[in-house]
Amino acid sequence: LYYCLTNMQEAIYSTKKGGGVPHVHISDIDNFEIPVPPVDVQSKIVEILDCFSSLEAELEAELEKRKRQYVYYRDMLLNFSDRKDVDWLTVNDVFEMRNGYTPSKSNRQFWEGGTIPWFRMDDIRANGRILSDSILHITDKGVKGKGLFEANTFILATSATIGEHALLTTDSLANQRFTNLKIKETLIQKLDLKFVFYYFFVIDDFCKHHSNKSGFESVDMDALRKMPYPIPALEEQRRIVGVLDKFESLTESLAAGLPAEIIARRKQYEYYRDKLLTFKRKEETAP
């Protein structure tokens, strides 16, 4: 019965009507017909469809397992708490910090024909954590204060969707949900940019655990500025980056392949479900 109703879902949804939030009326689906083949046939169909469902669930579990493995090893490599060969500063010692902002939407001169990337959380969701261009752009007239965020700096979500970051590979700006962090000139030669990128995952987690939840959620910026920041030897930073780059490449390869396999299995499942749950009426099969 479950598989039968799942197969009828589209037809059921097509009866939705009403103002506001459309919904399905029982009276509209009372006359929907459900085939009742012999119980042994039902059992065989369920066995086949259960097999397809199980295969899809196994693939999804494997994908989730690979992601957890990557996070585990990344966190292990970035944990310096027991290391005596690492110098420690604070986030405030390491970075210059600036707030993002949104130019007035009512002023067309700030937006029309703009070519300057202006990042929002949507850009990270759509294009990942290394950003070279944005969905929306502003003009130079929309830029104020100290100018653009420089290439090879970072944006960190410090309000709303807290604990997300990205590396900017071009001069740009971001909205007020982000704080821009630029490595201080005195530390440029002591920090590998990709190591800093990976260590932002630790900062992300710190932000999620140090936020003001009253009203509009935002990061406790005083706590963030005081957060300890490790400076391992440059050679060690590059070793960690090499390991994480390889692990990430492998994970991404699997993450790209497994969803495709899941989609293929789902299509296969839907094909056989439709075939197995399509029955001729008795009068159609009568001699």
Name the predicted role of every residue range.
Residues L1-T6, R120-M121, H137-G147, A151-F201:
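A short beta-sheet element
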Residues D30-K67, V71, V86, P228-R266:
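Amphipathic alpha-helical segments
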